[in-house]
Structures are given as structure tokens and as C-alpha cells.
Amino acid sequence: MINVLATVHVKKGKVQEFLRLFKGIVPRVRAEKGCIEYFPAIDFKTGLPPQELDENVVTIMERWESLEDLINHISSPYIAEHLEKEKELVEKSSIK
């Protein structure tokens, strides 16, 4: 099983627009072979001392059955199209 945490730093004031665009691909991604989980998460205030809030960060949590399934997902033409569309909304992103 492969777990992926993608951290997306969204341009100020663009988080809701980013989430609308992102949620548009979720059903298609979840239908892909090997996709176990795929969802976005945003920070909210919990009051816990170690928490660092960043209202412009979206964390995308993914779980795939295999590395091959993840590579096939990342290589999908519709994902390339999606990344091109969200480019205007994103400052930077990284995965772990």
C-alpha cells in the first residue's frame, strides 16, 4: 500500500476556487484502479498548542494499492489537464 500526502500552497484568497476545481476530479480518481482513498483537507483551529494554522494550505491525502497504480494515476492525461487548470491558483506544492 502506498500513502501520499500532497501539500498544496494555494494563492491567498483562492482556496475555495481550488477546492471546487479539485472536487471535480475526485469521483474520477476514486474510480481508478487501485485508489483506496483520495480527499482534500484544510486547516481549522483546534486550540491544540502545537498546531500551526495556514488557511492557504490544502493537504491532499491519497492511498493506493501499489506504486504502479499511483504512477498510472499521475500519468493520466486528465490529471495533466487538471494540473494545468490549477496552475493559476497554486504557489507551490510537494508530496511525501
Regions found by a protein language model. Give the residues of each.
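Active-site-flanking beta-strand signature of metal-NTP-handling nucleotidyl enzymes
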Residues: 3-8
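Structural beta->alpha junctions
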Residues: 9-13, 64-66
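Short, conserved charged micro-motifs
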Residues: 14-18
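Short amphipathic alpha-helical segment that frequently serves as the phosphate-/nucleotide-binding helix
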Residues: 19-23
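An amphipathic, aromatic/His-enriched active-site/gating alpha helix that lines ligand/cofactor pockets
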Residues: 24-36, 54-57, 61-96
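A general secondary-structure junction signal
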Residues: 42-44
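Short glycine-biased active-site loop of nucleotidyltransferases that positions the nucleotide triphosphate
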Residues: 49-53
